[in-house]
Curated annotation (Swiss-Prot):
Positions annotated to bind heme b b562: 83, 182
Gene: MT-CYB
Keywords: Electron transport, Heme, Iron, Membrane, Metal-binding, Mitochondrion, Mitochondrion inner membrane, Respiratory chain, Transmembrane, Transmembrane helix, Transport, Ubiquinone
Record function comment: Component of the ubiquinol-cytochrome c reductase complex (complex III or cytochrome b-c1 complex) that is part of the mitochondrial respiratory chain. The b-c1 complex mediates electron transfer from ubiquinol to cytochrome c. Contributes to the generation of a proton gradient across the mitochondrial membrane that is then used for ATP synthesis.
Source organism of the structure: Urocitellus washingtoni (Washington ground squirrel)
Protein name: Cytochrome b
Length: 379
């Protein structure tokens, strides 16, 4: 008798995606982050839903409503800090997931990769709008500074900014629409995730060697379900340690001061996961140039399939490319550090050099090194 999971229309989809899915036998722990991102998204949607039940998106009451959630709502403090730090865990998993894709050449699956980049943009937009909602000082000024960047667009810039603000400054209209978008975007992200998986399952997973693994596949369940559960336990342990021991470790103290349009904080900076892009933005003295560099710093990921000149897919057997990859990672850490520093010597020059290095490695050095490796192997 055929099993229900193989015949029932709904159970069949789940079966083909998570149970009888043929998976390469050699995928390492770096392949755990996809499922962890799914878990992060689920945590964020659930905690966010409960926060939305008590939050009010009005400039007069937003800050107080967040305080009320933390003080008066049953386990409100836990929900709020799980949501705030859940975003950090989300981005850690995202960066590692993208890094894995770059290292092992997963970007050669064009559709999966490009939808992944769109997902990255969507998650960044959602996180930015979520940061505005508590209506603290850094929320307000972060929103003002980042939305104001659009005014650099020639001709329509100013009109566009005022249209997004819903007035002549960040105010009630801005907060209300940011809340609306922040609420709806995660569901759009969930839909995009399904498309991401749809395209991935058309080709099957990549593996560390970068070789075709059709001759050596194993069922996803139980092998990778149990492996994913280990990742889930580690992620939840890390998240709960952060939430219960130092929930404000990654936040900004300025956000405990209610938003005041008349007083600018000495150092306006976004959350840690945007600092690398913020450093690239600040390293260019021209406003439009900075905005273009900021957008291109993420959009450049879409160029990776075109810049792949190696005859091998993965970096597993390419020591020179590996070396450049880890220099790129170190450069991103440097940019993250610089993004959190004030705009003064020597941080400005370090930021500019790190920004130049970031684009040079991706656009010039990695492709060149790939060609050198091809030559060394007489390919």
């Amino acid at each position: 008798m055929t099993k229900t999971r193989k015949t029932h229309p709904l159970x069949k989809i789940i079966n083909h995606s998570f149970i009888d899915l043929p998976a390469p036998s050699n995928i390492s722990a770096w392949w755990n982050f996809g499922s962890l991102l799914g878990l992060c998204l689920a945590i964020q949607i659930l905690t966010g839903l409960f926060l939305a039940m008590h939050y009010t998106s009005d400039t007069m009451t937003a800050f107080s409503s967040v305080t009320h959630i933390c003080r008066d709502v049953n386990y409100g403090w836990l929900i709020r800090y799980m949501h705030a730090n859940g975003a950090s865990m989300f981005f850690i998993c995202l960066f590692l997931h993208v890094g894995r894709g770059l290292y092992y050449g997963s970007y050669t699956y064009f559709e999966t990769w490009n939808i992944g980049v769109i997902l990255l943009f969507a998650v960044m937009a959602t996180a930015f709008m979520g940061y505005v909602l508590p209506w603290g000082q850094m929320s307000f000024w972060g929103a003002t500074v980042i939305t104001n960047l659009l005014s650099a667009i020639p001709y329509i810039g100013t009109t566009l900014v005022e249209w997004i603000w819903g007035g002549f400054s960040v105010d009630k209209a801005t907060l209300t629409r940011f809340f609306a978008f922040h609420f709806v975007l995660p569901f759009i992200i969930a839909a995009l995730v399904m498309v991401h998986l749809l395209f991935l399952h058309e080709t099957g997973s990549n593996n560390p060697s970068g070789l075709i693994s059709d001759s050596d596949k194993i069922p996803f369940h139980p092998y990778y379900t149990i492996k994913d559960i280990l990742g889930v336990l580690l992620l939840i342990s890390a998240l709960m340690t952060l939430v219960l021991f130092s929930p404000d470790l990654l936040g900004d103290p300025d956000n405990y001061t209610p938003a005041n349009p008349l007083s600018t904080p000495p150092h306006i900076k976004p959350e840690w996961y945007f600092l690398f892009a913020y450093a690239i933005l600040r390293s260019i003295p021209n406003k439009l140039g900075g905005v273009l560099a900021l957008v291109f710093s993420i959009l450049i990921l879409m160029l990776f399939p075109l810049l792949h000149l190696s005859k091998q897919r993965s970096m597993m057997f390419r020591p020179l490319s590996q070396c450049m990859f880890w220099i790129l990672v170190a450069d991103l850490f440097t940019l993250t550090w610089i993004g959190g520093q004030p705009v003064e010597y020597p941080f400005v020059i370090i930021g500019q050099l790190a920004s130049i290095l970031y684009f040079t490695i991706i656009l010039l050095i990695l492709p060149t090194v790939s060609l050198i490796e091809n030559k060394l192997l007489k390919w």
